[in-house]
């Protein structure tokens, strides 16, 4: 009998993961959400990792009405990369969380920076209009390293029906 793992051998540094490959439930809040990291498979190289969440949702802290955003997160890893299922669950945990657009956007970026200590990270949060005004929030940790190809986020501005 072989030691065949149905999904392949474990990648280095993944033994401590608590969510990947397991049944999970949506965390009730961003504070309850567990973000996990794994060792970067290409330490010493500069490359960009992009996550796009085109259907991000949260709640207005005053009215309780839903807010929607297209979020793009770009980062250049240091020693760590974020485990994507934990990121998905973290982002989904905002679904019932009341906070202003700016707060949600910056909280996401700061939580990732605290977890990963990346060489560089930026977030573009393109919020759909509320009261007729779209709010876009942009933040980054500083200047990106030279010589790294960082594609434009290319999220078109809100055009309504036009």
Swiss-Prot record:
<comment type="pathway">
    <text>tRNA modification; tRNA-queuosine biosynthesis.</text>
</comment>
<dbReference type="InterPro" id="IPR029500">
    <property type="entry name" value="QueF"/>
</dbReference>
<feature type="active site" description="Proton donor">
    <location>
        <position position="67"/>
    </location>
</feature>
<dbReference type="InterPro" id="IPR043133">
    <property type="entry name" value="GTP-CH-I_C/QueF"/>
</dbReference>
<dbReference type="Pfam" id="PF14489">
    <property type="entry name" value="QueF"/>
</dbReference>
<dbReference type="GO" id="GO:0033739">
    <property type="term" value="F:preQ1 synthase activity"/>
</dbReference>
<feature type="binding site">
    <location>
        <begin position="101"/>
        <end position="102"/>
    </location>
    <ligand>
        <name>substrate</name>
    </ligand>
</feature>
<keyword id="KW-0560">Oxidoreductase</keyword>
<keyword id="KW-0963">Cytoplasm</keyword>
<dbReference type="InterPro" id="IPR050084">
    <property type="entry name" value="NADPH_dep_7-cyano-7-deazaG_red"/>
</dbReference>
<dbReference type="GO" id="GO:0008616">
    <property type="term" value="P:queuosine biosynthetic process"/>
</dbReference>
<comment type="function">
    <text>Catalyzes the NADPH-dependent reduction of 7-cyano-7-deazaguanine (preQ0) to 7-aminomethyl-7-deazaguanine (preQ1).</text>
</comment>
<protein>
    <recommendedName>
        <fullName>NADPH-dependent 7-cyano-7-deazaguanine reductase</fullName>
        <ecNumber>1.7.1.13</ecNumber>
    </recommendedName>
</protein>
<feature type="region of interest" description="Disordered">
    <location>
        <begin position="1"/>
        <end position="39"/>
    </location>
</feature>
<comment type="similarity">
    <text>Belongs to the GTP cyclohydrolase I family. QueF type 1 subfamily.</text>
</comment>
<feature type="binding site">
    <location>
        <begin position="82"/>
        <end position="84"/>
    </location>
    <ligand>
        <name>substrate</name>
    </ligand>
</feature>
<dbReference type="InterPro" id="IPR016856">
    <property type="entry name" value="QueF_type1"/>
</dbReference>
<dbReference type="GO" id="GO:0006400">
    <property type="term" value="P:tRNA modification"/>
</dbReference>
<dbReference type="GO" id="GO:0005737">
    <property type="term" value="C:cytoplasm"/>
</dbReference>
<keyword id="KW-0521">NADP</keyword>
<keyword id="KW-0671">Queuosine biosynthesis</keyword>
<feature type="active site" description="Thioimide intermediate">
    <location>
        <position position="60"/>
    </location>
</feature>
